């Protein structure tokens, strides 16, 4: 299926979301397959994510992708900075020739409530409650998933395993308007870095991205 969302974030950075409805053979015509991936669904997600890179930048060099010890894919020459995410039937990718980037896509689910203590501070949880005051429990679950996705995109932007989602990744404010918004964040690993994470809700999913 075609792209369900695409945005030229700035002159050198592009974001895309792909609904995976094709068989493996569709992607294998262009994308090399990692032989270590044996699960059919994970293999399809892997192929779709890499296919999307070249949809955004046709000259993107698939063959030069390397995997860091942190499992983050990268290009040694850093000609392109990129991030890939997939969840269920969707793959998301962001590619830039000049900015550091991170992206995450998540399915909205009530399961996130069971693990909220692993990624949300008390202050952040109180902020979510204030945003859902007089609104439905559905919005509460949507915002929980969104905060998880926001922090995942920050984690991918940084690209190092040694990140504590509560200690190092702080969401200071969320500005929500209908099905999209912006989160003002602080990254506190090595030095205090202010970052904005944009997010979009679509088809019961959330995609979040950060560019710096």
Regions of interest found by a model, annotated:
Residues 1-212:
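Core catalytic alpha/beta fold that binds nucleotide/phospho-ligands
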